[in-house]
């Protein structure tokens, strides 16, 4: 029987009911807004032009000492659009854009939108076969390549089969010297008109605007088709429902603009509100609060790893009385949620869930803690066997839905409102669809994520959910399921650890997968194996304790700060493939020891006793 509430608890509950009700009333009009039909004439470019007409003289962007108003930004964008059109780019053409975060990235991408062309937003850290693959899988007619990343591009330039006139070099902050085999795009852009293009008004919501690529942590990146409708479906709620953004806000934007969170959610919120942004090339934990104070940023677009990096920094004067009020992003884990919110006095943490290619979206619109929020999509959670890595079915072959509080594989129904636009590769698109799930003929998008419904208290009767794990990021050891995220959260709290990347590895003559963690240590730390061993014993059950520990000088992440596991999993504890220190917890041992060649051979022989 539940204990009766005391007076203080009753008052807190009443305050929460009042707060949630006010929040709900405030966002109801925007929740009711439906995405445009695919035939409606609306696009990123037309939304930009509407914002410019309303906020023309207001500041739009601050970048490395340079400031532009909305009107000035639009004029530069129009000049780029006229220049690209003169070079033969037309509606439906794909153009690869490879640059760091900077003003020219935005003006060229929006210039392509003005024409009705497709901008392929390519990870600027890629090189070699992955870079070549992304350019070619997008069907790129031209490439806009920044001076700062041209060396990587030059290495694969001969394999692209493009004429010199199709390689447009974009200077970075100075005139520079255009390399042989390309043309200097900015050399004569100023000669073109600053007027809007007349054809922009004819671009439809269902037209493809962008290609945004998957991270490629387990293989070659896939190009997700982002229509104008899909961009609107992400950008509008980010600003209106999530951040409650207004023209007087200033955003801190340091996420890569080639990624959906930065370009769809961040820029979408800015365009729909008329707010300004402080744009940074890359995130810096040590300079974040100095920037926030100098530029008085009120909103921040995050991924969870950035929040963890900020918490790992020593307390500084600049974080005190900081101007940040609201944050929007994904991947903020429950173990640091309240610490992040409390230490930095954040009023509103709006976690969201979604993917560039998917049709499922969640948003924490009611500002609840430790949740990715609610959804308007039709979703179900079905049983998933993490050991066999497959969906569980009943005797009739039907999927089994899980109960509240139980993790399940998240599926989103594909219908007219919540479309699945897929990838450029039709086979890859079909592989993400499950059919005949509830009734014959239905189709559902397989997110590949384990999610569970949770209790968040009073929430207007709306179901709320929490991210649990990525399928494949859960493994089985000692007949128990081990969540890499849960173990990682616990290890991240260790005094030595900057970031823990947990994964499962095969061990000869052992059932399941043994846990392994790759640790990057805090600055100035030398790995204290005794302290870490004691911490693991104290905080993790035996089956969840990593068997192997690898010490890395720097965490392995993608350009969008996602932990890279594929190569680490492949290298595992194999001494010939790893130059860094590896430690092992022997069976029935109570402390980690350095893995030497003799014990390594014992493991390979299957006689170590695991």
State where each predicted segment sits.
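Conserved AMP-binding/adenylate-forming core of the ANL superfamily
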Residues: 36-41, 45, 49, 57-102, ...
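Conserved pre-ATP/AMP-binding loop-to-beta segment of ANL
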Residues: 169, 190-213, 220, 244-250
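AMP-binding/adenylate-forming catalytic core of the ANL superfamily
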Residues: 126-133, 143-145, 354, 412-414, ...
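Conserved C-terminal "lid"/linker of ANL adenylate-forming enzymes
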Residues: 501-508, 516-520, 531-610
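Conserved AMP-binding A3 loop
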Residues: 69-71, 201, 209-233
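Conserved AMP-binding/adenylation subdomain of ANL enzymes
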Residues: 232-250, 258-298
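Structural core segment of the AMP-binding/adenylate-forming
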Residues: 2-20, 86-87, 110, 114-188, ...
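Gly/Ser/Thr-rich phosphate-binding loop
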Residues: 187, 272, 294-302, 311-385, ...
